[in-house]
């Protein structure tokens, strides 16, 4: 609540969404300070930088529905790693199938080692194209925890940073929506996402 009142959630987002319209530099300085105080909370708080990807590649309707929630304190995660896809994200197999009946995408599969896996909003890398086995078959999806369909099957036993849960997630017909265009999930969106994440991780490391 204190961070929200200070305007430090979604601080790089435009003011019309509840942000401060700050550049990335003040955000990284804040990430350093927060990590120095509490590394676990720093992990949870800093994953708000996922909203940068949604802001850059999502549509206007997604902006209006999701960005204010992050500015008001809701949490985010990026769901990339799987049991058989870690550093090689081209091997991601979590399946995304469009349901004409439901009018949305349904996600099925397992994600592993997901930092802040119990977050409110998730950016999920999933395989949307039949027959494609490499990165060109992957798209980015937005999953809202309020929709249900995802269970936290395991919380990892780590040596430190226990305040930030690292989870194994099971997706079972979880309703989601496409972020941006199909097939650009890895080659464009994850690359942009990770560029911002590296700055945040570097700032946390300095703080620690």
What residues fall within each predicted segment?
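Flexible, glycine/threonine-enriched loop-and-boundary segments that flank and lead into catalytic domains
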Residues: 1-13, 79-101, 106-112, 116-121
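Short beta-strand elements
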Residues: 91-98, 125-126, 169, 173
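A glycine-rich, basic-preceded beta-loop-alpha segment at the flavin cofactor/substrate interface
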Residues: 146-149, 153, 165-197
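A short core secondary-structure module
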Residues: 104-150
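A short, Trp-centered hydrophobic/proline-enriched beta-strand micro-motif
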Residues: 72-80
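Extended amphipathic alpha-helical segments enriched in small hydrophobics
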Residues: 198-208
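Internal helix-loop-helix
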Residues: 2-72, 114-117, 201
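Short Gly/Pro-enriched turn/cap motifs at secondary-structure boundaries
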Residues: 84-87, 113-116, 132, 158-165
């Amino acid at each position: 609540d204190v961070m929200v009142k200070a305007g430090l959630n979604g601080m790089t987002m435009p003011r019309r969404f509840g942000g401060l319209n700050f550049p990335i530099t003040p955000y990284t300085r804040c990430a350093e300070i927060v990590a120095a105080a509490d590394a676990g909370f720093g992990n949870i708080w800093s994953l708000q930088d996922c909203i940068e990807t949604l802001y850059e590649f999502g549509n206007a309707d997604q902006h209006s529905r999701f960005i204010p929630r992050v500015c008001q304190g809701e949490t985010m995660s990026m769901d990339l790693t799987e049991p058989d896809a870690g550093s090689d994200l081209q091997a991601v197999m979590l399946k995304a199938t469009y349901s004409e009946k439901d009018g949305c995408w349904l996600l099925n599969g397992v994600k592993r080692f997901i930092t802040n896996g119990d977050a409110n909003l998730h950016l999920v890398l999933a395989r949307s194209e039949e027959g494609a086995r490499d990165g060109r078959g992957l798209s980015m999806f937005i999953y809202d925890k309020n929709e249900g369909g995802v269970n936290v099957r395991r919380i990892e036993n780590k040596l430190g940073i226990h305040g930030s849960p690292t989870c194994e997630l099971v997706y079972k017909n979880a309703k989601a929506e496409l972020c941006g265009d199909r097939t650009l999930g890895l080659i464009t969106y994850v690359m942009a996402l990770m560029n911002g994440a590296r700055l945040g991780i570097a700032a946390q490391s300095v703080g620690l």
